């Protein structure tokens, strides 16, 4: 049942025109520049405007429509650029030679400093967003279609803006509607994910498939029938996919295999485009739709059948976990920060998984051979995933400070985790120290042996081997699947698993089996180290958000506070907000190593050119396995070898990028200065470590203290 309140809030432009109207203090106007910072910090901090959960919920709900409007405007802009300022049609006719560009540059700049010639008689910057590839996969064959989609995007943006206004000012949902989780799950699963996937599968079958099949066969884009002709004229489809002549009969008579001409289970890549078989992705979206349509009927609403989340959570207790998940239902239905933290953690993890699938199972035509785009998409999804995971910790900490009520949480999992937080943090701290010293130690050993001229004593594939045997086993299991556990598949899910297959498009490697060795084993442990440190900082921020031995009354000071007064030395930068700040810094560290690993590994072992005799020449000549096993190798053969091209680019067609590269490093270094001033954070970490020493009765008589701001200042 949808419960709404009519006309709850007046629409008033006079009110909106007043800066800071949402806060009594800010509405008075500026006295210092702090007013400007607080205006930005609190405009969307709805918790600070009111304590009324219903009103907060409505504001969040309404703001989501605003967010969607911005996304539609942005997307519309992308499509408009494709229509108005791009060489899309030229690229479509020759995707292996023409480089994608949708960003016109003023003649004053000149093409000679921007990638040289992008092809198709076009002046502009080469783009690496993958939009051209996604447009081809969805069946867009002309710039006119891009114009139409761009206009459609603006119409949807207007609709979203209207919905945001309507659902706050005209018909605002009641709190009970926001808290009806079963109904929400049903509708989101069946509606958004189920019907969303189904409609996309429908579009792929009726529009993308026929158009892509003709494009793959070399038919000129201008000769291909328009999308609506494929939808309305069954004879056109029958020429490409004979099963269309039979209509729905095979579906209702359960002879589904009749449809295997457009819904397949092949595995591997299309040798023409280097992308996944579109008939495989059709099958995938259809299957996903079925799963989510079923999932959207699992939760109990008006009819007394199905799951109740409260019951599930309260039944979830093991022999060692006290009250288990009791009380969590109340948390998730009254604290949107807790809900958001959970969702960000899951979506962040998922986004990182997407990053790894984009290169190992490239979903769009000609994506795999566009190396710049592959690198950009991997970097993009890793970063977005990192931001979301850190955001999860941020909102978990805000939940702890603002929404957590210790009196209602007794002996459930959350309470138990908080009560043994010292054990958790000190163990995690130990794990970080162990991982850091050992993984770095392996590299230092190799550098030393290399310097002493003792290659036979190094950890490498040719001396002391540290093979990633579990990873190799997983790879092999998947590589042999097509002839054993997946008898109907023509190839394994990804060429990277192994085997002898190589897909090359236009003389460039799309994908081939990726070998893993000692070098990967070493850098993998650096990944483990950086990820654990990030988790340590973020988790410590959450578990000590309300109190710590250093500041027992942290909950009263709020989520962010500069220092706990002049009388308490070493309490600066110890708020939950500061932990997010430091966690973000380590997230950058972690992702840098991941992107270094990816770039070098792909250039060394995957990307390159293929001769007519099927001989592969990799970009950096397969030097990863022997060079990346020392710190010196990383510095010399990756960082310097790759950066020197940029540093020496001023006289080449890449000079504009060289200048941007220089500027970006200046911005980075300038912001890093401010980051390195953290002090109080360490004192709290020390408290946990002291606790561990006390536990084992090996505590020193002299208490350790972190340096204060003054002591730690570099004079």
Swiss-Prot record:
Catalyzed chemical reaction(s): reduced [plastocyanin] + hnu + oxidized [2Fe-2S]-[ferredoxin] = oxidized [plastocyanin] + reduced [2Fe-2S]-[ferredoxin]
Enzymatic class: oxidoreductase
Disulphide linkage map: none
Record-listed phylloquinone binding positions: 682
SUPFAM superfamilies: Photosystem I subunits PsaA/PsaB
TM regions (residue ranges): 60-83, 146-169, 185-209, 281-299, 336-359, 375-401, 423-445, 521-539, 579-600, 654-676, 714-715
Keywords: 4Fe-4S, Chlorophyll, Chloroplast, Chromophore, Electron transport, Iron, Iron-sulfur, Magnesium, Membrane, Metal-binding, Oxidoreductase, Photosynthesis, Photosystem I, Plastid, Thylakoid, Transmembrane, Transmembrane helix, Transport
Amino-acid positions noted as binding chlorophyll a' in the UniProt annotation, renumbered to this chain: 665
Cofactor mode of binding and number, as noted: P700 is a chlorophyll a/chlorophyll a' dimer, A0 is one or more chlorophyll a, A1 is one or both phylloquinones and FX is a shared 4Fe-4S iron-sulfur center.
Single GO biological process annotation from the record: photosynthesis
Record-linked InterPro entries: PSI_PsaA, PSI_PsaA/B, PSI_PsaA/B_CS, PSI_PsaA/B_sf
Keyword DNA damage: no
Matching Pfam families: PsaA_PsaB
Gene Ontology CC entries for this record: chloroplast thylakoid membrane; photosystem I
Residue numbers binding [4Fe-4S] cluster: 563, 572
Binding site for chlorophyll a: 673, 681
Molecular function as annotated in GO: 4 iron, 4 sulfur cluster binding; chlorophyll binding; metal ion binding; oxidoreductase activity
EC number from the UniProt entry: 1.97.1.12
Record family assignment: Belongs to the PsaA/PsaB family.
HAMAP family associated with the record: PSI_PsaA
Name of the protein described by the UniProt record: Photosystem I P700 chlorophyll a apoprotein A1
Gene that produces this protein: psaA
